[in-house]
Amino acid sequence: MIGRGVCCRSFHTAGSAWKQFGFPKTQVTTIYNKTKSASNYKGYLKHRDAPGMYYQPSESIATGSVNSETIPRSFMAASDPRRGLDMPVQSTKAKQCPNVLVGKSTVNGKTYHLGPQEIDEIRKLRLDNPQKYTRKFLAAKYGISPLFVSMVSKPSEQHVQIMESRLQEIQSRWKEKRRIAREDRKRRKLLWYQA
């Protein structure tokens, strides 16, 4: 973390590849003791390096940091034999690219398979027995989303009152801290749309 953010210096100094290919030996240096104060970022910030550019390969390179395809030509030594090689152009082919990720609801695309009879049946079932025929149950039965079920049908007034009374009972057991937090949340939600 420290080496990447402070300056373009490399942690990769101990490898034989650096000596073999003549890369400049760069080291992350600090003004403090390296072993005892390695996590103290202030030492890395206060240290003054010689001006210039330092090549720091990414730790996540799959092919390794000594591969000629990943090292820019400007950072290769003048005597490096790989400098004369033709570098392949990074062209992404459609076969190599991953598929575009899609949401769960749009994997198979939207379907408009319900007719007026099915929608009337959904309304009737939800009005008759909302305890058994919940939105989730009806959505699974007809292959639609629970949101669509709530759009085309409403539960009975009696069921709505029962659910509201249950909610009031739960909220009556809330402590003062939770009640204040929920009120603050409601106020913040109102501010979302007042820009």
UniProtKB/Swiss-Prot annotation:
Gene Ontology BP terms: mitochondrial translation
Chief location category: mitochondrion
Key words of the record: Mitochondrion, Ribonucleoprotein, Ribosomal protein, Transit peptide
Cited InterPro entries: Ribosomal_mL58 (IPR024388)
Keyword 4Fe-4S: no
GO cellular component terms listed in the entry, alphabetical order: mitochondrial inner membrane; mitochondrial large ribosomal subunit; mitochondrion
Subcellular location: Mitochondrion
Listed GO MF terms: structural constituent of ribosome
Transit peptide: 1-18
Task performed by this protein: Component of the mitochondrial ribosome (mitoribosome), a dedicated translation machinery responsible for the synthesis of mitochondrial genome-encoded proteins, including at least some of the essential transmembrane subunits of the mitochondrial respiratory chain. The mitoribosomes are attached to the mitochondrial inner membrane and translation products are cotranslationally integrated into the membrane.
Family: Belongs to the mitochondrion-specific ribosomal protein mL58 family.
Self-association state and partner proteins as the record states: Component of the mitochondrial large ribosomal subunit (mt-LSU). Mature yeast 74S mitochondrial ribosomes consist of a small (37S) and a large (54S) subunit. The 37S small subunit contains a 15S ribosomal RNA (15S mt-rRNA) and 34 different proteins. The 54S large subunit contains a 21S rRNA (21S mt-rRNA) and 46 different proteins.
Something else known: Present with 350 molecules/cell in log phase SD medium.
Protein name, as recorded: Large ribosomal subunit protein mL58
Source organism of the structure: Saccharomyces cerevisiae (strain ATCC 204508 / S288c)
Recorded name of the encoding gene: MRPL20
